[in-house]
Swiss-Prot record:
This is UDP-glucuronic acid decarboxylase 1. GO terms for molecular function: NAD+ binding; protein homodimerization activity; UDP-glucuronate decarboxylase activity. The gene is Uxs1. Catalyzes the NAD-dependent decarboxylation of UDP-glucuronic acid to UDP-xylose. Necessary for the biosynthesis of the core tetrasaccharide in glycosaminoglycan biosynthesis. Keywords: Acetylation, Decarboxylase, Glycoprotein, Golgi apparatus, Lyase, Membrane, NAD, Phosphoprotein, Signal-anchor, Transmembrane, Transmembrane helix. The modification Phosphothreonine is found at T94.
Amino acid sequence: MVSKGLLRLVSSVNRRRMKLLLGIALFAYAASVWGNFVNMRSIQENGELKIESKIEEIVEPLREKIRDLEKSFTQKYPPVKFLSEKDRKRILITGGAGFVGSHLTDKLMMDGHEVTVVDNFFTGRKRNVEHWIGHENFELINHDVVEPLYIEVDQIYHLASPASPPNYMYNPIKTLKTNTIGTLNMLGLAKRVGARLLLASTSEVYGDPEVHPQSEDYWGHVNPIGPRACYDEGKRVAETMCYAYMKQEGVEVRVARIFNTFGPRMHMNDGRVVSNFILQALQGEPLTVYGSGSQTRAFQYVSDLVNGLVALMNSNVSSPVNLGNPEEHTILEFAQLIKNLVGSGSEIQFLSEAQDDPQKRKPDIKKAKLMLGWEPVVPLEEGLNKAIHYFRKELEYQANNQYIPKPKPARVKKGRTRHS
């Protein structure tokens, strides 16, 4: 056992080392300032610049750094409800630094729960959740769900998976592993700790539907070997595993079949129709429409989806539930709408139709309305204006040479991404 005297000695040595390091740092800083001062005197003598303006050039960046440091020590978080220990849940969100996951993180944190975000940052970004870092209810873990995770939680929102065509076609094997092995690991965790698991499934399980609109009892029309099969079939297997664990192991599961969703924090280059059209319109490039543009989609704003996910998790509904906006638009109508909202003079360019592109997609949400009391409330134009504002700021950051991580490029032919 270490004696108190030895501990005091170690502490004293550490303090001396700290003082020495501080002294070295202060000396280096003083030397730098003196060098600049001498240089300024020389400049003044040569009549090139007054010493006062040079001092201001040096001091102002220092003031900025001090302000940044003060902000980091006095970080203000979004308002958080206080929940009693009985009501406060320990919640795990896989893929929680991604587009949808980060918005879900915001809601659950502000509702007063303890949230652990797990992400491998393949498509997720730390900047999406950095405003929570340091909060006592928040934890961020860099982890890939294809490896087991050991943690005590009450609820698991399993969102981890690439969701845009370029990302999951870039690495189809990884996509399959995330949706199968990753789901298996999360179900195993739910079984061990008695947690309820919500699987973020997708409308892609319906494939190119022969039934319109699509209700939860429709089995789908999917190409199992097509370019998108890694995602479509991966989610279908994930659903099957959820219900196998529910029947055999008694794990509580919830399955959300998510339709097209958009909003801030989408990757600008993720290859989906909303981000494609907004980015092209803002940059004055042609809006690329694949095929005739008569294909239909239904778009929901991200906050509506998040509310639906939370409602489903806390419900008694164990069968799959569609979460989407039943307001249907053709791709061509949607392109024209974004052009008008941006105020862009971009032309609309028609390209050859992509393989396996669904001709129609529209959710039947009667079940969500009846059993969850949920339906989308954000009007399409209101949501699009928010997304356009976000994309505009992202482009400004890039123009100012501020680093914005981008997803890895897909190894697919240009112009062949579907209207996801």
